[in-house]
Design a protein with these regions (language model features):
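A polyanion-binding, active-site-adjacent surface
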Residues: 2-134
Length: 134
């Protein structure tokens, strides 16, 4: 099974989860931002890695906007070089709108992580030879 197939299988299982009140909105960026997430997997997820960094609890201004782990918008657009459309989730919270790559907000942990990677490895390709962030 490829990494993309594994992720799609997990997404299908997660989509089966149902929540009751007080939960009103559940964002799954692997659905509405799949295009960018797929690009990220294909561009940076292949091959053997020495280090895999796992994140939890995606923030509202990072992966929730872009579909990319630690997906600080500027880093996704300029350093990782990903382009694409992010759709709206079925139910959107009015205080947490999904603006995708147009979001003006910055995600602090993503800015730090990708900033370190850019400073240390210069290009995402060099970083991805050894590291995979998920």
């Amino acid at each position: 099974m490829s990494l993309t197939e594994i992720i799609l299988s997990a997404v299908a299982e997660l989509d089966g989860l149902k929540f009751t009140k007080p939960v009103e909105c559940v964002y799954n960026p692997l659905n509405y931002a799949w295009d960018l997430h797929r690009q990220y997997l294909e561009k940076f997820g292949s091959g053997k890695k020495q280090v895999v960094m796992l994140g939890m609890n995606p923030g509202p201004f990072g992966m929730v906007q872009t579909g990319v782990p630690f997906g600080e918008v500027q880093a996704v657009k300029t350093w990782l070089g990903l382009k694409g459309q992010v759709h709206k989730p079925e139910v959107e919270h009015p205080k947490r709108p999904i603006l995708g790559l147009e979001s003006p907000r910055s995600e602090v942990s993503g800015r730090r992580l990708w900033g370190w990677a850019a400073q240390r490895f210069v290009t995402p390709k060099r970083f991805a030879r050894r590291f995979f962030v998920y």
